[in-house]
A protein has these predicted regions:
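Charged, low-complexity, helix/coiled-coil-prone segments
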Residues: 48-52, 119-128, 160-167
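Short, surface-exposed interaction patches in beta-rich subdomains
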Residues: 26-33, 52-57, 62-100, 147-233
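Surface-exposed or flexible loop/turn and strand-edge residues in extracellular/cell-surface modules
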Residues: 38, 47, 101, 113-115, ...
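Extended beta-solenoid/beta-helix repeat architectures
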Residues: 109-113, 119-122, 128-143, 151-156, ...
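Short, charged beta->alpha transition segments
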Residues: 102-106
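Short acidic/polar, Gly/Pro-enriched loop/turn segments located at secondary-structure boundaries
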Residues: 41-43
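Gly/Pro-rich, low-complexity intrinsically disordered segments
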Residues: 1-30
Length: 233
């Protein structure tokens, strides 16, 4: 799913604590980029059949393509962006019985350090964040059939998943380590060249290249994990 970036010359500005001066329609599909350096994106109602990508060619702070599906309402306040879908029962039936109708693409600006937070869970979602900078990732409500492509970390970056994870794939730069903590047991874990069938209870593992104080990812899963893969890109 392609989104053509809009032309919007950018200038260097410090991180803003007040809304950018440009106005935008909260029912539109784009938010102009205005020099922001850090943003938090929150999707409070869950997400399915979607991709979220940091695009090196993006000119907007955020752009959304929903095909024929319902569009979210955008809320922008200082360093906070929130996307809210107003689902009606008829929309839900249409999405269920029409394959591909609910596919969503969310494109983010590459010059921003992003914190992303999902509530309500993720299902069949691709998060390609490899071309940007990420400060934190939070997923509440569990996730299933999710692929997460990570950029080089600038610090120790937490990834928190509550509600369990199944069919979760994580790719990171070859030189980047990942620490893993799981509460609730693991079934079918692939950690680079290592494979484990099952671990009961709580587990603490890492990729073998995690050093205290050196930038890496810290993945914590509450609620158990099944078919979890962590590999180098």
């Amino acid at each position: 799913m392609m989104i053509n970036p809009t032309s919007d010359p950018t200038t260097d500005h410090p991180y803003r604590t007040a809304p950018p001066p440009r106005t935008f329609d909260p029912d539109s599909s784009r938010v102009p980029y205005d020099g922001q350096t850090r943003m938090r994106l929150t999707i409070p109602s869950g997400l399915a059949h979607a991709c979220v990508v940091i695009d090196p060619a993006a000119r907007d702070l955020l752009a959304i393509e929903c095909g024929d599906g319902p569009r979210p309402r955008i809320r922008l306040a200082g360093g906070e962006l929130a996307l809210t879908w107003r689902h009606l029962f008829g929309d839900w039936l249409r999405d269920v019985f029409t394959p591909g109708l609910g596919d969503v693409a969310i494109v983010l600006h590459p010059a921003v350090e992003w914190t992303v937070a999902f509530r309500g869970g993720l299902s069949r979602v691709e998060l390609d964040l490899s071309a940007g900078t990420v400060a934190r990732i939070d997923i509440a409500g569990g996730c299933s059939h999710v692929l997460l492509d990570l950029p080089p970390p600038a610090a120790v970056v937490p990834i928190r998943i509550s509600g369990g994870a199944s069919h979760l794939g994580i790719r990171r730069p070859a030189e980047t380590g990942v620490g893993l903590g799981v509460a609730g047991g693991i079934a079918m874990l692939r950690l680079d060249d290592r494979s484990l069938d099952a671990i009961g209870g709580a587990a603490q593992l890492d990729t073998g290249d995690v050093t205290r104080g050196v930038p890496h990812y810290e993945l914590t899963i509450a609620g158990g994990a099944s078919d979890l893969s962590i590999e180098r890109r």
